[in-house]
Amino acid sequence: MDHYDSQQTNDYMQPEEDWDRDLLLDPAWEKQQRKTFTAWCNSHLRKAGTQIENIEEDFRDGLKLMLLLEVISGERLAKPERGKMRVHKISNVNKALDFIASKGVKLVSIGAEEIVDGNVKMTLGMIWTIILRFAIQDISVEETSAKEGLLLWCQRKTAPYKNVNIQNFHISWKDGLGFCALIHRHRPELIDYGKLRKDDPLTNLNTAFDVAEKYLDIPKMLDAEDIVGTARPDEKAIMTYVSSFYHAFSGAQKAETAANRICKVLAVNQENEQLMEDYEKLASDLLEWIRRTIPWLENRAPENTMHAMQQKLEDFRDYRRLHKPPKVQEKCQLEINFNTLQTKLRLSNRPAFMPSEGRMVSDINNAWGCLEQAEKGYEEWLLNEIRRLERLDHLAEKFRQKASIHEAWTDGKEAMLRQKDYETATLSEIKALLKKHEAFESDLAAHQDRVEQIAAIAQELNELDYYDSPSVNARCQKICDQWDNLGALTQKRREALERTEKLLETIDQLYLEYAKRAAPFNNWMEGAMEDLQDTFIVHTIEEIQGLTTAHEQFKATLPDADKERLAILGIHNEVSKIVQTYHVNMAGTNPYTTITPQEINGKWDHVRQLVPRRDQALTEEHARQQHNERLRKQFGAQANVIGPWIQTKMEEIGRISIEMHGTLEDQLNHLRQYEKSIVNYKPKIDQLEGDHQLIQEALIFDNKHTNYTMEHIRVGWEQLLTTIARTINEVENQILTRDAKGISQEQMNEFRASFNHFDRDHSGTLGPEEFKACLISLGYDIGNDPQGEAEFARIMSIVDPNRLGVVTFQAFIDFMSRETADTDTADQVMASFKILAGDKNYITVDELRRELPPDQAEYCIARMAPYTGPDAVPGALDYMSFSTALYGESDL
């Protein structure tokens, strides 16, 4: 059988799966684990003639880790990698981890990279996994798991010792007595246990650790001070150390195993005997309870009152809820115990159990069946009796409820039917009262069924000789008499409501006609007042003319509006005549509108007053718009001249910069004269600014007489000045380049001609392909092969350092001047510094100050980095990096 099958693997690895790795962040626990795990590893590595000092460092290359596994397993691992690279280390660690996994161990979140990186938490977790697999897994006491078996072994070995109570692998060991007890139990000559004191843990711990190391060959894996100074010592460190004691004393286990075997047999026999006694007692108690309960359930004596029957039902419910469930459980447990006992006896080769007479499981089941039958008959009888009494109580309660509901419904109904609220109501209120009365009639008809039900229930109670029948009959008669009276009052009120409705309908029609015509006329007047008082905002002559035309059209509608006003007032006067003639009691005003004749007359007068005010406002605005139009035309006339002039000058400058002839000095003089002529145009720009200021003050936002805005003119003017200044600057830079590089005028003209030839869009710049064609025309050998492409990329990085994708003429001139003239280089400067330094690779401060002018010497001293070569002397400076930095080949 495989000792490391899946079941055992799960058992001994259970602590690892439950291990909270974050606890390793506790410095005290980490310290204990470091020391314990290091000592445990060294106790095995010393067999191979080696050891470790730093647990997270010495296992990083995987060599000692593989050696440790070979020692503790007695097996050979794959040949390790001897290289020093990270990949070799990871390979070795993976071989070790694969070997551990092959033993049925689950490696939870442990990877080779973390071990190689020296991750303390992962390294300690890996060593703990190894300890579990190879030092603790095989520990088993009475079929317990590894951890529980080790704990049980400790408890049994220390049980006879006072002040020792091993419950765990942390605080139970803090006083040191547990370690001393383990040693004394197996080697009593090594420790005088009677002299140990519980209040002196340091002495106890040091005594146990020293004796174990000296006489038992168990290395010292813990520090007494660390255990005492920690509230909860690390469980894994304690388990590792205690497992060493277990293996050291494993020889003493044989006698204990034999004793355990005998105890186990006796325990099984005692347990079986106890189960037999429990069965007999439980069966006797259950049968006695059934015997007492059946007569109670067979009692069928009836009760006269509902309360008494309900009490019997409540007692029966208590029996079902409180008394019977525990007995059901006892019966079930009795059967379970019987079956369990028979199984245990059969498995342990004992004879089957035979209960005493009358206490067999079948006897109990028969008695229980009799109980169930009596219980069922008793429950049916209770329910029938309760139903019989409930019927009478239900009918009486039903009569009272229906009578109460009917009486509550009729309360106030007679007073409501006698009131004359319709005499002062409006037509809508009359119609509402009629609808309400119709609803009441429907409600009255619906309640007819309830009255009939009340009479029928009273009749049934009389037939069943209900004890309180007289009061029921009196109440029923009163309800019937009241019902007849409500019917007569209902008919009388309907007739009165219908008469009043007809009288008010005529007035209502006139009110409705008034409202239909008054509302739109009122809206028209309100709209007219809003329009006449509306603040208009216009920007053109056309807009103000449109407003004036609309106002004249409005004034033409006023006579017809006045006729409509008089017609509406005539309807109101007709209503007043009808009210006076027929003495109608009007409770309120027109229900269809809140508009009164007084409001109509008041708003009409207001409209007549607003018309001349609107006339005056439109006249004043018309004059203002005429003035604004003159300002627009004045600005447009000037802008239409200045705008094209600026555009023309911009185009001329573009042509001049491309088509310049003569010497650079002649071109520069020509450009400056051209710039002067442009600057002399400034007064016209200022005059246009003045006109623009007047337009802004007049709040004029558009101008159909020109497409040019002042902002457009300003931007164009600034661009014009900037362009001529930039062109002059380019010519000045060309002169500086020519003089500095010794370029002749013929070369400059040739460069300009070549550049202009390939600048086909006259933009003043060359694209990459245009620039490449230009270089080829000047004799550069730039092919389409990889070498040619690389050379062209190098040149582009010089002329277009910002990678804008274009080459300016100035960049072109700079490049051509560097290509055709002698230049100084970083190598030349380094060679010069080497001469000053006496052929050394560095230079000193004194040499710089002796050979160079003071200001230049201090400049070099402040910027040169210290020289760090093997031949450096104090104060040596690195002139090589300084020289390359001067030419942008490194950082200065």
Swiss-Prot record:
One example of the protein's molecular function in GO is: protein homodimerization activity
Residues with the N6-acetyllysine modification: K95, K195, K676
Write down which residues bear the modification named Phosphotyrosine: Y12
Membrane-crossing residues? none
Q: Which GO terms describe its cellular component?
A: bicellular tight junction; cell junction; cell leading edge; cell projection; cortical actin cytoskeleton; dense body; focal adhesion; inner dense plaque of desmosome
What keywords is this UniProt entry annotated with? Acetylation, Actin-binding, Calcium, Cell junction, Cell membrane, Cell projection, Cytoplasm, Cytoskeleton, Membrane, Metal-binding, Phosphoprotein, Repeat
Q: Name one GO biological process term.
A: sarcomere organization
Entries under InterPro entries matching the protein: Actinin_actin-bd_CS (IPR001589), CH_dom (IPR001715), CH_dom_sf (IPR036872), EF-hand-dom_pair (IPR011992), EF-hand_Ca_insen (IPR014837), EF_Hand_1_Ca_BS (IPR018247), EF_hand_dom (IPR002048), Spectrin/alpha-actinin (IPR018159)
List localization entries: Cytoplasm, Cytoskeleton; Cytoplasm, Myofibril, Sarcomere, Z line; Cell membrane; Cell junction
Which residues lie within the region annotated Interaction with DDN?
274-733
Domain EF-hand residues, every copy: 746-781, 787-822
Residue numbers spanned by region Actin-binding: 1-247
Positions bound to Ca(2+): D759, D761, S763, T765, E770
Subunit structure and binding partners: Homodimer; antiparallel. Interacts with MYOZ2, TTID and LPP. Interacts with DDN. Interacts with PSD. Interacts with MICALL2. Interacts with DNM2 and CTTN. Interacts with PDLIM1. Interacts with PDLIM2. Interacts with PDLIM4 (via PDZ domain). Interacts with IGSF8.
Report the function annotation for this chain: F-actin cross-linking protein which is thought to anchor actin to a variety of intracellular structures. Association with IGSF8 regulates the immune synapse formation and is required for efficient T-cell activation.
| Name of this chain's protein | Alpha-actinin-1
The gene from which this protein is expressed is: ACTN1
